[in-house]
A protein has these predicted regions:
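Conserved structural-core and active-site-/substrate-pathway-adjacent residues in large, well-folded domains
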Residues: 51-54, 70, 123, 172
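Alpha-helix N-cap/helix-initiation motif
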Residues: 37-41, 45, 83, 87, ...
């Protein structure tokens, strides 16, 4: 989704005042990330909506005709999961792109639902962690995305990449409370 911004804004000042661009220091990012994680009034619906929308976008981006697989929790498997058939994500992109709040690859087209780069973290509005399993270039790699004791969002790779015959894509899993 293309995010439109006013491009012809003209700011006129009566004097050449001292000024500075406002930024966020790395050590303060945890507070902003916490606000972004907790901005949903209905976290359960947000998880379903955001993860499903990302799966639809991933399939579209990859040209996949397969439907995303949505699994609802049960007493035998108390996990909500969505499996897409997009391109999957390399370790470099998980650590360099997926890990960044506000980073999105979908801002150049209106065919995608997402664009703000925060929906991927929606599961953290419901619980303190979720899993992301990537099927990419013939390998399967699982990651745990969690909020640590300092309220920082972290991603840890759970194992070395394993050979896989599974189709490319991502599977996001969110454990649910009883």
């Amino acid at each position: 989704m293309i995010i439109t911004q006013e491009k012809n804004k003209q700011v006129v000042q009566s004097h050449d005042f001292d000024q500075v661009n406002c930024t966020i220091d790395a050590e303060d990012m945890r507070y902003v990330a916490s606000l972004l994680r907790n901005n949903y009034s209905k976290p359960i619906l947000a998880v379903i909506r955001e993860i499903t929308a990302n799966a639809l976008d991933a399939n579209l981006e990859a040209g996949s005709k397969k439907r995303a697989i949505v699994k609802v929790p049960s007493s035998f498997s108390p996990v909500f999961s969505v499996r897409d058939f997009g391109g999957g994500i390399s370790k470099e992109d998980v650590f360099g792109l997926y890990s960044k709040y506000g980073k999105s690859t979908k801002r150049d087209s209106n065919i995608y639902i997402g664009a703000f780069g925060i929906g991927k973290f929606a599961p953290l509005s419901y619980g303190d962690n979720f899993t992301c399993t990537s099927y990419h270039n013939g390998y399967k790699t699982a990651y745990n995305i969690f909020v640590d004791e300092n309220d920082d969002t972290k991603i840890v790779r759970l194992h070395e990449p394993e050979l896989s015959n599974e189709p490319t894509g991502l599977c996001i899993g969110v454990a649910v409370a009883n």
